[in-house]
């Protein structure tokens, strides 16, 4: 059994696989190929639907806390590069974000927001967030902790697009180097948000309320060990799962029902960004989310076509969107 994202065993066994994004033309899937959308799911200019070798971004899921007695402030990594984070400055001052509410936002509204913040206030721009929520999604956990994930409405957060593209087929030496790079990038982002003098002082103070939980990952500098690898190799199996398997066949109907189903789900079809910020775009390339109805997943997605005695329950047979 190969229950890894990377699928190294499946590849060694000679099972054909895919890496990257299919074109929209191949399976007719929403959000396939190169695509730009406001968060959530409002198409914008620049989308081509073309296939490429882009892999959606990875990050670390952080255990954060605002409990002063259990908080470790983010250290400044030795490889810190301020230039990686400076775009956050204008985003904080103007309130610029990737929500569909930005459709009605004018340049004057963003300048008014800048003046509003300069007066010691928090942002008032539609769709914007302040403090830790500008950089990270916050899901509450017990003991005054949170699961900190990438902030989908931001241009810069804990995801590190593009640099992870080689991960699925690379050696573990390369993967370990990227994991260290991603850790340093993440720590640098939060250190910047807590300390850079060009950010509003009250924004920095709000950020300083948060840190890593000091009773978690104590043997790893309070930092998660595992990169959140959202997608790696996708093998070609007895059944190839696409978006059409998770979307209703018609209004008021349900998705196709698979008689060989081994599980059911209702999670959205979603992807994180595949590219870094680009001038003039309303969001990062590839950031999409589409609601589904309850759908079934057939056994064939974990059975390789041409190899016996092998199951692939994580690097399954399916498209990028599927």
Residue ranges and their predicted role:
Residues 3-321:
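Flavin (FAD/FMN)-binding glycine-rich loop and adjacent Rossmann-like elements that form
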């Amino acid at each position: 059994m190969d229950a890894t994202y990377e699928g190294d065993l499946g590849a060694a066994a000679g099972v054909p696989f895919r890496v990257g994004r299919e074109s929209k033309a191949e399976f007719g899937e929403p959000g396939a190929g190169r695509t730009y959308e406001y968060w959530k799911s409002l198409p914008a200019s620049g989308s081509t639907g073309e296939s490429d070798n882009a892999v959606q971004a990875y990050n670390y899921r952080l255990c954060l806390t605002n409990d002063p007695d259990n908080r470790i402030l983010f250290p400044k990594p030795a490889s810190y590069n301020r230039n990686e984070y400076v775009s956050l400055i204008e985003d904080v001052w103007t309130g610029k974000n990737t929500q569909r509410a930005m459709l009605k936002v004018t340049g004057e509204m963003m300048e008014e927001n800048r003046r509003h913040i300069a007066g010691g206030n928090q942002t008032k721009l539609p769709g914007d967030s302040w403090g830790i929520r500008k950089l990270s999604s916050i899901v509450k956990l017990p003991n005054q902790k949170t699961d900190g994930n990438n902030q989908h409405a931001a241009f810069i957060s804990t995801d590190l697009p593009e640099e992870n593209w080689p991960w699925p087929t690379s050696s573990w030496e390369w993967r370990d180097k990227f994991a260290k790079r991603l850790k340093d990038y993440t720590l640098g982002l939060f250190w910047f948000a807590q300390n850079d003098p060009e950010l509003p002082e009250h924004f920095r103070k709000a950020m300083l309320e948060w840190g890593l939980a000091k009773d978690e990952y104590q043997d790893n500098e309070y930092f998660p060990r595992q990169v959140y690898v959202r997608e790696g190799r996708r093998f070609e199996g007895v059944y190839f799962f696409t978006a059409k398997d998770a979307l209703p066949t018609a209004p008021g109907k349900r998705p196709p029902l698979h008689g060989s189903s081994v599980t059911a789900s209702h999670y959205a079809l979603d992807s994180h960004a595949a590219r870094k910020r680009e001038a003039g775009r309303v969001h990062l390339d590839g950031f999409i989310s589409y609601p589904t109805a309850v759908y079934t997943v057939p056994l064939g997605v974990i059975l390789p076509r041409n190899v016996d005695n092998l199951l692939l329950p994580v690097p399954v047979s399916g498209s990028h969107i599927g």
